[in-house]
From Swiss-Prot:
Coiled coil: none
Membrane-spanning segments: none
Signal sequence region: 1-21
Family stated for the protein in its record: Belongs to the UPF0319 family.
Name under which the protein is recorded: UPF0319 protein VVA1446
Domain of life, per lineage: Bacteria
A Pfam family matched in the record: DUF2057
Keyword annotations: Signal
Amino acid sequence: MNIIKPLTCILAMSISGLATAAVTLHVPDDVTLFVANGQKAKLSGSLFASSKTIELPNGENQIVFQYEPYFSQGNDRIGVESNVIIAKFSANDTDLNFELPKYRDHRVAEQEIKQMQWQLVDEQGAAVTKSEDKLVKSGMQIGRDYAREAADYNQTGGIAAIGTAVSVATIKTEPVADVETKVKAGDNTAEEMLHFWYDKADEATKARFKAYINQ
């Protein structure tokens, strides 16, 4: 059996599903999002918008951010910085917003912001379960490479750490029903890809794939 046809089918269905399945994180202007899932965060939105957004995949995500509310004092604006926070959370097909503390003035903020309590809330106002930690760097804090620091943190296995990407060769696959197991040597790569995408697909996609190859 030519395995390329079902491979193309499941690949197309998987990509189609991924294209419409995402988490939208809204980032207010007093939050600096440094890193999302190991990469420098790329936000969408106009320059002067009160908040911007970033699209994240369904499932587990990790972010690195800092909260810096501003306060007016005479003609000056005073910013008070939180710790740099690394956090992981899981969500699917939803919009998320930061829920952050509000302080009466900069003096109160300076006293309390290092121990701030914050949440990510979904469209129904429910808090998303998260794990957080401080992303600490000793010495001078100028010119920090947050993506590198997040990668190093993940290697330590901290409470907000996420696993590194798994290679195709190490993924445990389940056999596809009714697919011939004997293939020519030249089809090995295609078979591995087929197993990979099948294992990544949701149950609905798997069902459509089985129906397709049984035609």
